[in-house]
UniProtKB/Swiss-Prot annotation:
Source species: Janthinobacterium sp. (strain Marseille) (Minibacterium massiliensis)
Protein name, UniProt field: Large ribosomal subunit protein uL16
GO CC terms of this entry: cytosolic large ribosomal subunit
Pfam family, one: Ribosomal_L16
Gene3D superfamilies: Ribosomal protein L10e/L16 (3.90.1170.10)
PANTHER family in alphabetical order: 50S/60S RIBOSOMAL PROTEIN L16, LARGE RIBOSOMAL SUBUNIT PROTEIN UL16M
Biased composition (Basic residues): 1-13
Amino acid sequence: MLQPARRKYRKEQKGRNTGISHSRGTAVSFGEFGLKAIGRGRITARQIEAARRAMTRHIKRGGRIWIRIFPDKPISQKPAEVRMGNGKGNPEYYVAEIQPGKMLYEMDGVDEALAREAFRLAAAKLPLLTTFVVRQVGQ
């Protein structure tokens, strides 16, 4: 699973996931087809991997897949049945915070019908709304 190799600080505050993706990471840059987020939320490293596996299994050895997001925010949790207080819990997993317009995955080397179905299977593993996009001519 994806996670940062090192961090300056182990724990991070919750923060608020606001705004939209304006220019960076909003266009199909590497492949021919893309899966773009139209909802807002957090995607865990496990969900990113589950979606990648679903796509890879569907296209078999056909094309190439790019993952355009990385889970770099640690989420801490206290153990079960522990009383409140006594500090913040330990980092349990990592998430990528997603704003609307962010490109999640890209694919190349397959036809559109196969890519559309692979992205549909991947979208079922993700907790936010997505849409299928095709690279524009001249991009």
